Amino acid sequence: FALLGHGLGGDVALDLIRRAPDRVTRVVLMATDPLAEAPQIAAAREARMVAARSGRLAEAMREEIPPSAIADSPWRDEILALVGDMALGLGEGVFLRQSRALQRRPDQQKTMRRVKLPALVISGDADPLVPMRRQEFTANLMPYGKLSVIADCGHLASLEQPEAVGDAIEAFLNGPVMLR
């Protein structure tokens, strides 16, 4: 099967590949950081977790995905509202578990070097949370990795530029499975 993961979902996809490499045929990673979380980012995340535990989940989400994480567009506010509503709908417990998982995520570089299957890394050209240089690094870690940069796009590519993301994924999935 083919896998696609965004952010923490990309970490989950890499873990599945590590555990069952023969079951995965292709992987798409979006806004996925292959490195363990830096101490200063983990500390800032801890402050957001305290806010969420104190009944301020909406505030924590505004800090987790700030307006600057979304490329300037007429629908920026709509995307931020959607993300905030999703977080509130899922609740504090999910936010806390996901935050803790991000804080504890392992360095995935070794796993990525072993990914011997077609891999597509999708990056927004204006993503400040997982910048394009990091995404380029991610693609280059994998022997068959390819980078697709989405223009006028921040951290949430599938919401900001859904057609461009869909086109990139479709071309990748319909492409040959031949490896370099």
Protein language model regions, located:
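Catalytic active-site module of serine/aspartate enzymes centered on a nucleophile-bearing elbow/loop
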Residues: 144-180
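Short beta-strand/loop motif that positions the catalytic acidic residue
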Residues: 115, 121-123, 127
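Conserved alpha/beta-hydrolase catalytic His-Asp/Glu region
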Residues: 37-40, 56-114
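Gly/Ala-rich beta-loop-alpha elbow adjacent to hydrolase catalytic centers
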Residues: 5-9, 13
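Short beta-strand immediately N-terminal to the catalytic nucleophile in serine-hydrolase-like folds
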Residues: 3-5, 30, 122
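Flexible "cap/lid" loop of the alpha/beta hydrolase fold
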Residues: 14-63
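Glycosyltransferase donor-binding loop in the core domain
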Residues: 87, 127-130, 154-160
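Short alpha-helix in the alpha/beta-hydrolase fold that links the catalytic acid
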Residues: 117, 131-140
